[in-house]
A protein has these predicted regions:
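Active-site proximal loops enriched in glycine and acidic residues that flank catalytic Cys/His/Asp
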Residues: 35, 81-83, 95
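Short, aromatic- and glycine-rich surface loops/edge beta-strands on solvent-exposed regions
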Residues: 88-95
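Short beta-strand/loop motifs in extracellular/secreted proteins, especially
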Residues: 55-57, 89
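Short beta-strand elements
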Residues: 108-151
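Short acidic/polar inter-strand loop motif in beta-rich domains
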Residues: 95-113
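A surface-exposed beta-strand-loop module
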Residues: 66-88
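Contiguous mid-protein beta-loop-alpha structural module that forms a pocket-lining wall or clamp
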Residues: 1-3
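Surface beta-strand/loop "capping" patches
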Residues: 5-51, 60-72
């Protein structure tokens, strides 16, 4: 889709951003972050590729545990933790899956995607064109301060 965006869509040309964290804030036991979303709104999807603990969210040092992940806007995710996280911890996105695939390997999973209506011209799934969603990318995000990604 990034190639299509850059070559064929004159309105969006040069504006592609992957589905990644744009800004983050921490208030007590709540982490709220916004994402660059190619085709809003965000979708919390645990059916298409599977579910995993915390919808793919965890804290690297384990200073708090994810209790709830919810979408609170077209580009905003709210994570409720069991307690306030350590400011030296990092939010990990995509590293909580423990379920092996059919080949026995365990792959990263994030249950957040955009609402792209684009489909593959060649790949089919259950008799229908394969959807080309933009899934959230794997990330390690500092939570020690608020930031905004301006790229």
């Amino acid at each position: 889709q990034a190639i299509f965006w850059h070559i064929y869509d004159p309105v969006k040309k040069g504006t592609w951003r992957s589905n990644r964290v744009k800004s983050i804030t921490v208030s007590g036991n709540v982490i709220t972050y916004t994402r660059h979303v190619p085709y809003p709104p965000l979708v919390l999807d645990s059916e298409f590729i599977g579910d995993c603990p915390g919808k793919g969210h965890s804290l690297e040092l384990g200073s708090a545990t994810v209790e709830l992940v919810e979408l609170v806007g077209a580009d905003t995710v709210k994570i409720t933790l069991d307690q306030a996280p350590s400011q030296t911890d990092h939010l990990l996105i995509g590293f909580t899956n423990t379920t092996p695939a059919n080949n026995g390997n365990i792959y990263p999973v994030v249950c957040i995607r955009d609402s792209s209506t684009k489909v593959s011209r060649k790949v089919m799934r259950n008799g229908a064109a394969f959807p080309l969603y933009n899934w959230a990318v794997l990330e390690r995000v500092d939570i020690d301060c608020s930031f905004t990604d301006t790229l």
